[in-house]
Amino acid sequence: MLQRFDLDSQDLLFKAESLIVNSTNRYHVTLQIARRAKQARYEEMENLSEETGIKPVLRAILEMSDELNQPEIIGG
């Protein structure tokens, strides 16, 4: 069953903007987001029982901004 997550659009825009501002190359960040979204989509297709209810692009932006703001997540 799909769960619905309430995402604040302003917060999401702020996180996406912070990714772009903190990068040296906007194009590179855009490609990273697209690759992660594509990977997330394929992972969801493999694990049909674990649907998140959030679009892959939004999920990629949230994950990447968390990694930027909290480097201890990725072991840094």
From Swiss-Prot:
Q: What class of enzyme is it?
A: transferase
- Asked if Disulfide bond is a keyword of the record, the answer is no
* Protein name as annotated: DNA-directed RNA polymerase subunit omega
User: In its keyword annotation, does this UniProt entry include Manganese?
Assistant: no
Q: What EC number is given for this enzyme?
A: 2.7.7.6
GO biological processes: DNA-templated transcription
- Reaction catalysis annotation: RNA(n) + a ribonucleoside 5'-triphosphate = RNA(n+1) + diphosphate
Organism encoding this protein? Synechococcus elongatus (strain ATCC 33912 / PCC 7942 / FACHB-805) (Anacystis nidulans R2)
A GO CC term assigned to this protein in UniProt:
DNA-directed RNA polymerase complex
Q: Which family does it belong to?
A: Belongs to the RNA polymerase subunit omega family.
Keywords of the record: DNA-directed RNA polymerase, Nucleotidyltransferase, Transcription, Transferase
Provide the assembly information: In cyanobacteria the RNAP catalytic core is composed of 2 alpha, 1 beta, 1 beta', 1 gamma and 1 omega subunit. When a sigma factor is associated with the core the holoenzyme is formed, which can initiate transcription.
Q: Which molecular function terms from Gene Ontology are attached?
A: DNA binding; DNA-directed RNA polymerase activity
Main function: Promotes RNA polymerase assembly. Latches the N- and C-terminal regions of the beta' subunit thereby facilitating its interaction with the beta and alpha subunits.
Query: What HAMAP family would the database entry show?
Result: RNApol_bact_RpoZ
Q: Gene behind this chain? A: rpoZ
Q: Which domain of life is it from?
A: Bacteria
